[in-house]
Amino acid sequence: MINSVFQGRSFLAEKDFTRAELEYLIGLSAHLKDLKKRNIQHHYLAGKNIALLFEKTSTRTRAAFTTAAIDLGAHPEYLGANDIQLGKKESTEDTAKVLGRMFDGIEFRGFSQRMVEELAEFSGVPVWNGLTDEWHPTQMLADYLTVQENFGRLEGLTLVYCGDGRNNVANSLLVTGAILGVNVHIFSPKELFPEKEIVELAEGFAKESGARVLITEDADEAVKDADVLYTDVWVSMGEEDKFAERVALLKPYQVNMDLVKKAGNENLIFLHCLPAFHDTHTVYGKDVAEKFGVEEMEVTDEVFRSKYARHFDQAENRMHTIKAVMAATLGNLYIPKV
């Protein structure tokens, strides 16, 4: 008899999970969030050891996995870029086989999707994708939990992603939304439209869920009847040399109050996976302002601090949703079907 449909599975990309499974994980996240708020212990991973592999640096992902593991009674061990050899002095396969004998679960945040897939293939333990260049699945659970908390549902809502339409967050929002029945609009310049295969994948899921997929560079078409406006940084990690080009290309796709008003929905919410470059209160922000004359990038400070903003709720939800994924895949919970 199968005790859990999740036990032992890796969480590498949203497309690997059904709508019912993703909805279950979002619901479990809400439950674990409630337990946390009421200070009720939930040590589903007591005695477990979790490896946190970070090829790319992070604030939210590292903090979320660390606190989630501790709340679940597990011991997290951080291994940064200087601590792991993945493909450098030791193959990913060999590293995976070693870590799988020492740890009960592995988180990986890095560049290559193939690398996280190899870790899952050869470690023999659940592997969780904390971000790769292609997908950002743990972010999606937090995003759609935040949307559900604000609207009480997901199906039939419209989420508009503004900016670089070919990055990992755009890919994941598009596919996950299509699976969950959320209309997803990508508002982006043609040069940065999502890859054809990603759009086709999303359209396939949308046919099943009844969702709508729209890729456009027209602001009026993009934000009409929007419930959620979402943006991300204009330059992803590893692409810093393209900054001048991106600023010029993406300035018309900035989330500002004019765009918010264009949506015509006072109940609209704004999301951002963070960090956000909305002012010059950072070394990076000052540098960009000096070099390019831009003091606010993907979102204006006005929108970032407005009544529409939910990004700090969204950031907190990283912890609760990551906790749900780890508990479901490693905690021997009784989930015979969803």
Curated annotation (Swiss-Prot):
Keywords: Arginine metabolism, Cytoplasm, Transferase
Enzyme Commission no: 2.1.3.3
Record-linked Pfam families: OTCace, OTCace_N
Signal peptide: none
UniProt enzyme class: transferase
Family in the record: Belongs to the aspartate/ornithine carbamoyltransferase superfamily. OTCase family.
Name the UniProt record assigns to this protein: Ornithine carbamoyltransferase
Species of the source: Streptococcus pneumoniae serotype 19F (strain G54)
Lineage, opening ranks: Bacteria, Bacillati, Bacillota, Bacilli, Lactobacillales
